[in-house]
């Protein structure tokens, strides 16, 4: 399933798991889960509300990083690297045989330069607000903000002064269908 720039989509998988897909996202999933695991592949950003099944763990694969859950809610973003933010429950991030457990209100980020998964405590709201039609930015670089806005509104952004990309901003915006409604 491929969601284009400026789009969003939600679906319920065969096991009852609900998935919200953000703009420029691809989700590969089977029509029906067979075997001992429920496995999907993700590129982009998705929010998962995973149906509990202790006998059949749910796995999200992104390259050689796997997030494993038994029933929980989390956001996964692969636009720039692999980032998982846990809302409720417990998940593990696995890469190259290394496993890191996340607790609610924690973010795990795979750092390919170090081959490590880094964990930090976060406010989950800015990471999941997109699912409810909002953008929330907290001390975020203008470059990162414009990346998100360009994915949603299908914009191409050019900077005459590249130093502006590093300016940090905070604020809340509603996600409108037309960028003109922002101004």
Residue map of PLM features:
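A residue-level detector for the "anchor" residue at the start of short, highly conserved motifs
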Residues: 1-183
């Amino acid at each position: 399933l491929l969601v284009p720039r400026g789009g969003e989509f939600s679906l319920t998988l065969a096991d009852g798991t609900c998935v919200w897909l953000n703009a420029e996202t691809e989700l590969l999933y089977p029509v029906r889960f067979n075997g001992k695991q429920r496995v999907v592949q993700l590129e982009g950003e998705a929010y998962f509300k995973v149906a509990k099944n202790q006998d059949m763990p749910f796995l999200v694969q992104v390259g050689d990083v796997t997030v494993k859950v038994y029933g929980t809610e989390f956001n996964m973003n692969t636009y720039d690297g692999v980032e998982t933010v846990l809302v409720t429950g417990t998940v593990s991030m696995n890469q190259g045989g290394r496993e890191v457990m996340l607790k609610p209100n924690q973010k795990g980020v795979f750092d390919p330069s170090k081959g490590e998964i880094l964990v930090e405590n976060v406010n989950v709201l800015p990471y999941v607000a997109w699912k409810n039609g909002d953008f929330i930015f907290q001390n975020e670089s203008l470059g990162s903000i414009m990346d998100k806005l360009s994915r949603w509104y299908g914009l191409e952004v050019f900077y005459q002064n590249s130093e502006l990309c590093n300016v940090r901003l905070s604020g809340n915006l509603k996600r409108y269908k037309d960028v003109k409604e922002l101004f």
